[in-house]
């Protein structure tokens, strides 16, 4: 038991109450000091460093609005659609809560995509922050699962058929696919059993995992310290410190960055509320018009597409056709040949590469392209987990990389946006070809990163962070 701290009898009531709690639960106060008031962050944070806090804010909005929606929602195939309409029409302020939740889902992905992009350009996945990045990617994967399961709950036409299409993709997995799809659906078609399963996962299981990953992400971040736009370590063994041992290039998170984030939150909430009140459907991108029609298992919509934040990966799924498989085989053979003849390695390893390439090519010839589309869609997310070990650049931040790296990253962003656009559009010959090129570029960006990230002469990295006082 820790020794109680004494306080002056003349202290204010606030100080006395604070001292009373601190004597009885000192761990909470220690955590506040470690993670907020005495957590030193680099003093040169910029615009890109607001999105982590905004992601936490949106997570809270989603949890709170979700609780109120569950009070009135009926997870029954015969009642689900009507219960959503009841929330919108008869529950006091139900329309506002529903629009906050639906807009919050899209806002969550906006801030998470921007947060991940900041990590990409500033090298926040590099040593010693590999675990921070891995936990972040796990959060992204968990968020996708949460959004997909919640997407079915309104039980509209697009929800129903979107879930039908995605769940059927699991049936393409050799040997276990049909049984796995049946397990996920709980029936031979998407129905009441599927709705109940997705509801339980969306409301209980996935949020618990998501919250655990968020805590792990923050703990890992605060243990190794935040990165900064220069990619310079402010808490390393050679970093300058003051007499108290605090980094000279750091400032306490509170009050400096709490005020910084409060301003960002204010701007974000103005945009967020403007969308809720004036364009909650966002032209059919946040809430699809087909979802205002009750689910009809006997009537398939003309065009089935996922919500906008899944569309880049949906484009990659559609890009893998039987014709595309031959291009992928050429890539596999070419990659194996390049590895064997370009790099020095033991003969045994060369043999293993040849065997692996032969197995992959044989699998591509024997297994349907639909399965490889699923692999591409999943692999597009999984490959992000390996980013810390793919980047061989001598510098972290894009600021000090060769200029052509910036153009490459810009092309990557444009390619991702184009894939997202194509995923919303109905299939077409031109769209298919463009999405195939975009898919090859997406994977080539990461797979070839160990090679292209070394090319070029980086600019000198400063010993300390660059900071100009405002």
Indicate where each model-derived feature is located.
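Membrane-embedded and interfacial regions of multi-pass energy-transducing membrane proteins
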Residues: 2-107, 111-470
